[in-house]
């Protein structure tokens, strides 16, 4: 979503001093229509009419044209109630949790044309909040249903994890995108885009737990084999150690590794193609192997050190909490 919002805005990214993009001034009428299409894989029949078949070609276009744009588009309008109504509609209209998560994407599509109309950094910051709100609303809805159906032991376990996730998400966002001072007026856009990403991921985690209770089949989406943010939180709401793998500004694959009470290092990695990433610190003092285990976290093993390295050869650290 961040790429969509940044399209066409090469200038105007200076430091406007916009720290808070959560402004929600309600205008007289919503600029987004109520229609959201649904995907229902369980109820598909082979006896669809010719008319339905012909209309299939137009499905995507109707999904993407639910927004009325005009010269006075109000980016400060509070869409929270509109989004909640859309999410409730998706929940009641989806045949399974798998379909539900797919249909939430149609709400994202519904707001995309309006977000693409943003011309200034402030408008981009404000509109980026909508997509985070969509997944945050879905996550809360999923949690409410999970809480109602889970047995006490399961609920206690997942509740502890959820509280830890909530407690850490601000810190991991800062670790991933940096501070406001580093990013200037783009900070709210970067913040909302990353919160959207990790909240969507968390929605899938809770949906998976709910599916187990309901006896539904549910397939988690594949996580990147190279990039992600993983932490060791010692079963608390604090980040003790962290591993971030991402693509740098110049296209290089970089990793930031911080180990509790030892130190941190930054460097680049090469994908060996066997599920392992070969890491070398920028100063050459640390070499090691990163293993990304998808939703189950990641690990880092130090294979070689030289000089005044912050880590010891043979040391291995696990980062079991995946964001």
Describe each PLM feature range:
Residues 217-240, 320-323:
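Tryptophan-anchored aromatic micro-motifs
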Residues 118-133, 149-151, 181-195:
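Second-shell loop/turn segments in exported
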